[in-house]
Amino acid sequence: MNFKEYVPLAMRTCKSLPTADHINHMCLGIVGEMGELVDQIKKAYVYGKAIDQVNIIEEVGDVAYYTAGLVQHFPALADWLDSDELKQSINYEKLEVARENITRTILLNAMSAANLAADLMMFADDDNLQDANAEQVAKALGTALFATAVLLEVDLSQACE
């Protein structure tokens, strides 16, 4: 399943809110779920627990759900997440190096996602939604989330089931 196919399925369960509230809800959801993802990594790093791959897939799926909610207002985001251009924009060599310090990298990606979500919330009112910068921020957020999924070896299509 690609992201475009996933969005309408995911949004069947999404509460209907005015545009600005909906975008804020999705951005806050992304930040919260990235926090839960970081918590899983923390448990492995600090307490030596094995990474629970099933839970990791669930958390990435939750992040994908909230990202799907942004697609309603930034349709280009779905195209971006399904594009070869996104996959080519990821520096896989850097990700391999980053994998050596996965805790730090996941934390940096989570912080990046949180900052981008906060930036996106500034565009939440209808007057600013058409701003080209809003679409760029949405794409950057999608890239941070995709890179995190790649780093954790989670196939987004698997997480979107």
Which residues make up each language-model segment?
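Flexible "arm" and connector segments at domain edges
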Residues: M1-E161
